[in-house]
Amino acid sequence: MLKKPFTHYSFSNTLEMEECCKEHFSEYYQGSKFNCNVTQLTTGRLETNTICAPVKDVHLEVFSSNQALLYEEEANINSISFCWIKGQEKGVRKSETIISGHRMNSSSIAGFNRISKTGGNAWNILGANDTLYCMSLRWERMKERIQSLNAYNAYAKIEECIGIDCETMSSTQLKELVIRHFNGQQIKQPSKAFDLAIACLEVDDYSTDIRTSRSTSTDLIEDIVKLIHQDRNGMSPISLAEISEHLDSSKTSLNRACKSMFNMNVLDLAKSIRLEQVRKALSCQSLSSGLRIFTKEQTAQYFGFSKWRAFEELYFRSFLETPEETIERTREINISFTKQNGGDS
């Protein structure tokens, strides 16, 4: 196999992350279109680290951030994900990471639903200071292997579940396979990753595993996140009443579902997303820094922040920098990365 180096990325801006993800996906899946949105949910300066390691028909990634992040992406037909977090030591704070509605702990594997819908979206919350491992498998090869093994339980879980908690030999071996790869013991047979992933899903022991199934609540959260992100072409931000009408759900139900996952109501989530959209607009290098400074107040108004002084205070409390400092810092955005010998392809 042709060896490819690991690629290390360090980001301090969500726009950088989005552009890198889109480019990386398009390159790996030969021009396939892909869209994603990243929103910082906690306050403070953002620092993230990512290591990507492509292998034939497998894409491995390890990601960490000092801030909690909401990550939304389009469901696709190219790959299926298996994600887990680095195990926590006893006495360490509880993980806040949620993958597609499945609350993660050291025995969790989730992310299957990115392949199970057409025209939908998938969302994750990466908890601050958690380390997330993600293995994406090419779906066509995965499907062929499932069929050849008659792994009907695995297929059913992909369709019905968004995550499982289990501690089996296959789940342990899968995690160790990926961790060893990042530690220099390269995956030489990608088929092993497919077989171990299928084995994790094929286990059907209700006494030892806990699963989160698709539900009206998880679907509602997906719809809320997608709806808030949609560009309304200069219209005022979508209201709770409009969301309620569009999703045919009561305001109480919407807020209850939102608080259960994000610990905030729908309007607070919308404010966080809109604030992040302003930061991305102020960071956009397709416009000169001078023009971004000149139009900063209009940019804030476009995303629903009509009172500039109040917006400035909120912006600083959220990101520990002023809008002007964001523009200056992103005058020339450079993705910081280094390469070292690593994965196969």
Segments predicted by a language model, with ranges:
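Alpha-helical bundle regulatory/interaction domains
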Residues: 2-43, 89-233, 239-241, 245-251, ...
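Conserved short histidine dyad/triad with adjacent acidic residue
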Residues: 45, 50, 58-76, 119
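Glycine- and acidic-residue-biased ligand/ion/polar-headgroup-sensing regions
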Residues: 65-98, 107
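DNA major-groove recognition helix of helix-turn-helix
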Residues: 258, 266, 270, 314-315, ...
